[in-house]
Amino acid sequence: MSAHEVSSTKNSEIERIIKEAEDAGPENALTLDLSHLNLRELPYEQLERIQGRIARLALGHNFIKSIGPEILKFTRLRYLNIRSNVLREFPESLCRLESLEILDISRNKIKQLPESFGALMNLKVLSISKNRLFELPTYIAHMPNLEILKIENNHIVFPPPHIANNDLQDSDMQLFIANIKGYLSRNESVFRTRSESTVSAALSASANLSHSEENDSSVVDSYLFSAPSDTSHAVSPGMLTFVTPSPHSHSPAGHQQSTPKSTLSKTNENSEGTLYDSNVAHGCTHPPSLNQLNKFHLDASPRQARPRRSVSLATGLNSPSVSKPPSSATGPLYHSPQSSLTNSSVASADVQERTHNTNGASPIQDQISEFTDQHQNPSNNDAASTQSILKTAPTQLSASAKTSAISLPEVAKKERNRSNSTNDDYSSTRLPSSVLHRLEALKEARKLSEQLPNRIFAQDPHPSPRLKKEETHENGSNLTNDSVNSYFSNIGGSEVEMKHSAFEKTLESSRGILFSLSQVQQALRQQLLFCSNPVVLDSMRHVLHTANVQIKRLILCFEDTQQSNDGTANINSIVNASLSCISSFRKLIEVTKKFLNELTSRADVRYVRLLLLILFDAAKELQNALVPLSPSQPHSGNNIFADQVRQSPTSMIRTASGLTNRIVSVEKPASVMNPEIDKQIQDQVALATNSAMSVLTLLIDAVPKNNQPDLVNENIAPNLISKLRELGSLSAAACDVTRKLKHRLLTFQTNPEELEWQLFLDDTQAFVKSIIAVANLAKALSSEYTFQKSVLAGLSAATRSTKDLTILLSSSARHYTESSLATPVPLMSPIARVPATPLSAALGSAAQSITSPLIMSPAAIPASAYSTNKIDYFTDADGNVEGLQR
C-alpha cells in the first residue's frame, strides 16, 4: 500500500470518528477518540470545524512528537489523553489551556515540566507516570483543585522517594498529594535559591568555557556527576553538578589525541539527566550549548569521565549516585565530593607529589587511600558537597602507574574493605531496599517533627491572634528539642557528683519526666501534619507552646544544678519544674482526648499507633516519677508535697489506656491476687447479672405493651410514651451488655490472666453504667406511670446486687492501698485523681456517676451506713415496695 493510500485511509478513519462523535453528542461537548491511528501530528485541518466543541480528546498510542499552538483553539477542551507518544518536551501550548481539568501525558520521554505549567490551576487529574522526570516543580503545591497525581516509574529525586511513595499513592491519594504539596511548599525557597545560583553559575561559566578553549589543550574531555552527600536534604537536578569538558587537543604530529574508551559515555535515552553530547564521542571540539548547561554548575577544570550509574535514580536516595571506581590501573578514579578543590594549581601540585613519590607507592594507591580517608572523615559543609571535584586526567599519570607494584586483586581488596566500612557512604548498597526506605522515612520524619509546616487554611481566612503567636514561636520548639537532646547527650560527662541518695532519685525522676514530655511533644507535632482543622491546630499549638516553656524551665534547673557545687541547693526548683511539666502533660492529654478523632482520622495507622504507645509509656513514666519525688523534701507546712497523696498504679494509666483503646492492660489490683476475694467478686458478678437479666427481660416485655395509649390509658401524654419507648431501648441495650459480662466472666474463669481481668473490669464498667441508666429513667417515670409490682421488685433486686458488688470491690481496695483514704487531694495537685479503687480504675469516668447522689449509689454512703440503714433504691424507709407506686 502506497503512502497516499495510507494517508487516504487514515483521513477516512478520522472523518468516520468525527461523524460518530457528532452523532453521539452532546453538541458542545464532543468526545473524540483518535488513539491507535499512527498519527504523527494532530489533524488540525479535519478538526477545524468542530474545534470549539471538543471537550474530550484522546490521542494515545500514536507517534506525536509535538503539539502546536493550534490546540489553543480547542476552547472547551477539558480532558486530554496523549499517553504513549514520543514527546520529549512538555508542549508549551498545553500550559495555556486554562479549561483543562484532566491531563494524561504518561508513557512519554519528558524530562521536566515547564514553569508555565503552573498556570493550569483548574487541573484536577494529572498523570505523568513512566516518563523521565527528575523533579516535581514546586508550583504543584499551589494547585488547589488537584485530586489525583500519578508520578510512578520516573527518576524523581525531588521530592525524595519516601515522600513520593508509590504504595501511599495507591492506598490514599489524598494523603499522598498532601505529603507532596507539604514537602514542595516547605522546600520552595531553598529550591528557588539553588536554581537562581545554578543559572548564574552557568552564565558565568560559559565565558570561561570559550577562554579555556584557547589555552587549555592537554586535557581529556570528560563529564563528572556528583550528588550531595547529605541525603537528609532535598535533592533536585538543580543541586547536581555536571562539569563541562574542555575541548580535545591535537598531538604535535597533528593527529587528534586519543581518548581512552573507558572514559566515554554511551548515548542512552534512558540515562538520567546526562548532558552528554554525541559529538564528544567523535572528538568534536565544539562545547555543549548553553541551553544544555543552563541548569547545572559548570567548571572548566580538568575532569575525569563521568562514572557510569550503578543503579537507576528511580531508587532515589537509597543508593549512591555514582558507581564505584573501577579497579583498572588506567581507569578513572573518583574522589569524594566532600574534598572538593577549586584551585587548579593545587590539583597540579597534588598530581606531581603523588607521581614522584619516593616510597614506591603508586599514584593509584595514594588516591585510593585518600578516597578512603575522606569517606571515613566526611566534611559537614553542605556547600562543599555540591561543588565539583578536581580530578587527575589519565594522561597526566606517570608511567609508574602502569608498572605499579600494586596488583589488581590488591586494589579489589582495598575497595572491598572500603565498601564494608561503616563510615563509607557506599556501604548503604549492602542494605536491603526496604531497610533503606525506612531509614530515609525516619530521617524525613525527624526533620518534620522539628518544625511544623506553614499551613494555608482555606477554611479560616482570618486565623486567631493566638495561632499567629504560636506560629512565631515554632523556632522556639526546635530550640527546645535541641536542648533536650543536648542535655541527655552531655549528662554522662558533666554530671554533678551525687552525695545524697534522695537527691539522686529526685534528679533521675525529673529526667524521666523531661524525657517523657519531650517525646510526647514531638509525637504530637508529628501527628499535627495530618490535621487540617484550624481550630484543632490552634488549640494543640497553644498547649504545645506551654509544654515548651515548662521543658525549658526544667532544663535550666538542670543546668543550674550541674554548675553549682552543691546539687541539693536547687532541689526545690527541680521539683517545682517537674510538677509543672506534669501539669502541662495533663493538659496535653486532655486536649488530645478532646480532638482525638480529628488528629487520627486522616493519619496513617502507624503514626497513630506510635502516638498512642508514646502516650501510654509517658503516663507510666510520670506515674513512676511521682513516687521518688514525694519524699525528696522534708515534710513541712509549706511543702508542696504536704497534701500530695500517692497514687495507685492504675490511676495514672486511666488516661492513656483510654487513648490506646486498652491495647495494653493496666496492673491488676491486689484484690485479684487474693483467691478468696477473687472468688467473692466473681460470685457477686454472677448474682448481679442474673438479677439484672430477670428485670431487664420484664421491662422489655412490659414496656412495648404498656406504651400503647389505646391499651392502657388514652390520657397518657405523648412525651411519656417517648420516655417509655426510650426505657425499652435502654433495657434491650443493657440486656446485651449483661450477656457480654456473663460471657466475659466465664472466659476469665477459664483463662485467669491479667488481660482477661482488665477486659472483665471493662465489661463491669459497661454493666454498671447500663444498670444506672435504666434505674435513673425508671425512677423518673415511676412518678408518672404505674409499673407492675414484679417489675419494681426486679429493679429492687438488681440495684441491691449491684450495690453489694460495689461494696465488695470498694472494701477489697482498702486492703490494697491505705493512702487512697488518707487526706483529700488538693485542688492544685498536678494530676487530679479519682479515689483509687479497683472499681474506679475499671470504670474511669463512670466512677464519678456511681458516687452521684442522684442514683443513691452506696459509694456515696459511708461504710457504716450499709449495716445500719439499708434503704433500697425502689423501696421506702419501711421496706414497702408499694410505697413508691401512685
From Swiss-Prot:
Feature: compositional bias, Polar residues: 243-277, 312-347, 394-406, 419-431
Molecular functions per Gene Ontology: signaling adaptor activity
Region span, Disordered: 236-288, 301-364, 394-431, 455-483
Organism superkingdom: Eukaryota
Family annotation (SUPFAM superfamilies): L domain-like
Localization per Swiss-Prot or TrEMBL: Cytoplasm; Nucleus
GO cellular component term, pick one: mitotic spindle pole body
Pfam families: LRR_14, SOG2
Keywords (A to Z) from UniProt: Cytoplasm, Leucine-rich repeat, Nucleus, Phosphoprotein, Repeat
Ranges: LRR repeats: 28-49, 53-74, 76-97, 99-120, 122-143, 145-166
A single BP term in Gene Ontology: positive regulation of establishment of bipolar cell polarity
Post-translational modification Phosphoserine, affected residues: S301, S464
Family annotation (InterPro entries): Leu-rich_rpt, Leu-rich_rpt_typical-subtyp, LRR_dom_sf, LRR_domain-containing, LRR_R13L4/SHOC2-like, RAM_signalling_pathway_SOG2
Main location group: cytoplasm
Listed name of the protein: Leucine-rich repeat-containing protein sog2
Protein species of origin: Schizosaccharomyces pombe (strain 972 / ATCC 24843)
